[in-house]
């Protein structure tokens, strides 16, 4: 992280909001427990790809960052009401969401996934007929599963506030599978041989930071993200948290337009 912040400090950046605004913290809401994006270490410190990214943006804008733990489904109301300035938590940009919130440019491309017990009867989407599956409330996994439940023959969708309770139910066989973002699940199961990510579901998702609709601060953050991409900070974060160099044409590297 020190190397990353050194790269940020080397950038020639600005503070369009003035000296008084520069002293105010940027309040960032995050669904802590959403590995590897934002989670708490044993000592209680918040870490993760998006925690590092939020702090890098704050460094670039010359403002401290305050992280607030909010369940995923509560992030939308929190940012709309002004309780927080930015929401992060592997939030997918969608046309539906753009009707009520704003986004900066994307910085990660993703897909959905099916996670199951490694030795269980369910090992594919085809095995979900008559089964109970879990999703995170209000997530794109929830949306995808709801749209496809009838075609897949899913008997019941159970909705959770965060990954931990869903994984407890999966391990105890109260649900037969869990549908969620693939990077989080691949990271989560890496040291859990009794669980397996068995399906990658292509959805063309892109993650970004979320703002209140029409908030001009989104333009400042968007430009900071552009500079961080140009400086290689986003690519370094990707390599740090995912163990791989992002593709040159990926949303992690390429400067992109804000979605409108």
In which residue ranges do the predicted regions lie?
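Bacterial N-terminal signal peptides
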Residues: 6-16
């Amino acid at each position: 992280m020190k190397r990353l912040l050194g790269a940020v400090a080397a950038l020639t950046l600005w503070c369009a909001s003035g000296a008084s605004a520069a002293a105010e913290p940027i309040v960032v809401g995050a669904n802590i427990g959403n590995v590897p994006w934002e989670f708490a270490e044993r000592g209680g410190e918040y870490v993760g790809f998006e925690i590092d990214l939020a702090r890098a943006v704050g460094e670039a804008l010359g403002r401290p960052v305050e992280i607030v733990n909010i369940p995923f489904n509560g992030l939308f109301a929190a940012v709309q009401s002004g309780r927080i300035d930015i929401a992060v938590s592997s939030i997918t940009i969608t046309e539906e969401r753009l009707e009520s919130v704003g986004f900066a440019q994307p910085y990660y491309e993703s897909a959905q996934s099916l996670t199951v017990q490694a030795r269980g009867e369910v090992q594919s989407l085809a095995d979900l007929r008559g089964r109970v599956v879990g999703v995170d409330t209000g997530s794109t996994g929830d949306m995808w599963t709801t749209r496809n439940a009838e075609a897949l023959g899913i008997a019941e969708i159970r909705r959770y506030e965060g990954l931990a309770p869903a994984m407890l139910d999966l391990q105890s066989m109260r649900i037969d599978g869990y549908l969620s973002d693939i990077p989080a699940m691949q990271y989560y199961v890496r040291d859990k041989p009794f669980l397996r990510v068995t399906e990658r579901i292509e959805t063309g998702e892109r993650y970004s930071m979320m703002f209140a609709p029409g908030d001009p601060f989104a333009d400042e953050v968007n430009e900071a993200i552009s500079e961080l991409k140009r400086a290689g900070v986003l690519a370094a974060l990707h390599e740090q948290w995912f163990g791989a160099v992002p593709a040159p044409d990926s949303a992690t590297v390429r400067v992109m337009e804000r979605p409108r």
